[in-house]
Amino acid sequence: MNLAIKVIKNTAKQFVSELQKESKKASRKAIGRCGLLLRNQARRNLKSSGIKITDSHYLGDKLVHGVRTGRIYRQENSFKRNVRITTNRRNKKSGWFRLGWLNSGTNERFQKKKKNKSVGKITARNFYTNAVASFKFKEKYDEIMNKELSKLKK
């Protein structure tokens, strides 16, 4: 009798641990896909903002590749994936360092204070901040999580 109860407890523990593993996998996949969806939304906003760079050094460069996702990693009891604007310090010829300014804008700059010669300012396009604000993470996460869990049940 005692042996039968131990066997039932052990199988129940194994079942719960397998469910936890599978739900963690599903959560990891859902976080990853949500990160990709957010990145793609920010890239679409950047393309539609009408930003053109005419500098000869940056002619072939694609600014959209400066909006990137990081790897999925564990943070405490959950998973995390960063979506960010990259500044490429290795390749000085890529225009990615401009993305932060294009997103948030700059104040008007002056060359010399005595003559008040204006160099200009960059108007904020807010392609990244609008993507983050409009992205409905909870809905997307629940939708993807339900799909992944339904695949596991089959």
PLM region spans:
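Short, Lys/Arg-rich flexible segments
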Residues: 1-93, 104-154
